């Protein structure tokens, strides 16, 4: 068996499976460290009492020193995002002239991006990418009959981006040839006033989902088959 099949062997304890999937195969700074630079309120000057001493007046009252922090890191993140996506991405399709079917396909692709609000999503993705150094965008379908794409469709395509900025932990599993074997992510969701932690994993042919039950994990629903035979998402890091 290959590595990912061995890890996800149903005969193994679920806790062992998830522990193996959490072995991050890339080196990315943790958000707990990055946020201290990204959020200006966490900068050292906000609690500096050495170089910015409070002044004690003769009557004993204290005049607190001005501690002004500047969010240059957050501004830089915004500027880099603007450089990339302030002007929306324009896709160019070749070899479509004189081919009606190809033109219809190109229009359908553009409609998919339009109704997935890709321009807004790109700005969100770039902000998260430059701030937290990693993102994962997943594409999925919801069953909703529509004609948005120029033809009758039973499904609607949507996308969602996960990043450590939103409290989501990403766990890509990449082999020595830089091929992604699995993409996992862990997040907490409020269900009926209760905080529940979930763990999801996508492979080329299956989608797994577990939830934390006490100190252990238990499956949620059945394993979903992925007909695309590809992980339906894109992971980026820097």
Language-model segments: which ranges?
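Structured, contiguous alpha/beta core segments that scaffold functional sites
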Residues: 131-132, 138-238
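Extended, helix-rich architectural segments
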Residues: 1-165, 174-178
């Amino acid at each position: 068996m290959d590595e990912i099949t061995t890890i996800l062997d149903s005969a193994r304890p679920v806790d062992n499976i998830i522990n193996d999937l959490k072995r991050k195969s890339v080196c990315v700074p943790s958000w707990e460290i990055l946020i201290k630079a990204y959020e200006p309120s966490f900068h050292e000057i906000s609690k500096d009492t050495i170089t910015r001493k409070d002044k004690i007046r003769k009557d004993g009252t204290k005049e607190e020193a001005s501690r002004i922090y500047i969010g240059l890191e957050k501004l830089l993140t915004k500027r880099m995002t603007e450089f990339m996506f302030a002007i929306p991405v324009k896709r160019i399709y070749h070899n479509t002239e004189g081919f009606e079917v190809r033109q219809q396909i190109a229009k359908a692709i553009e409609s998919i991006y339009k109704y997935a609000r890709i321009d807004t999503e790109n700005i969100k993705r770039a902000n998260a990418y430059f701030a937290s150094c990693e993102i994962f965008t997943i594409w999925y379908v919801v069953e909703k009959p529509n004609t948005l794409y120029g033809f009758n469709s039973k499904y609607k395509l949507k996308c969602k981006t996960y990043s450590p900025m939103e409290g989501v932990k990403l766990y890509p599993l990449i082999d020595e040839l830089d091929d992604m074997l699995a993409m996992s992510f862990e997040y907490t969701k409020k269900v009926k006033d209760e905080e529940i932690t979930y763990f999801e994993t996508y492979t080329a042919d299956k989608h797994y989902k577990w939830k934390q039950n006490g100190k252990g994990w238990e499956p949620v629903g059945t394993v979903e088959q992925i007909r695309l035979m590809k992980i339906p998402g894109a992971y980026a890091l820097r």
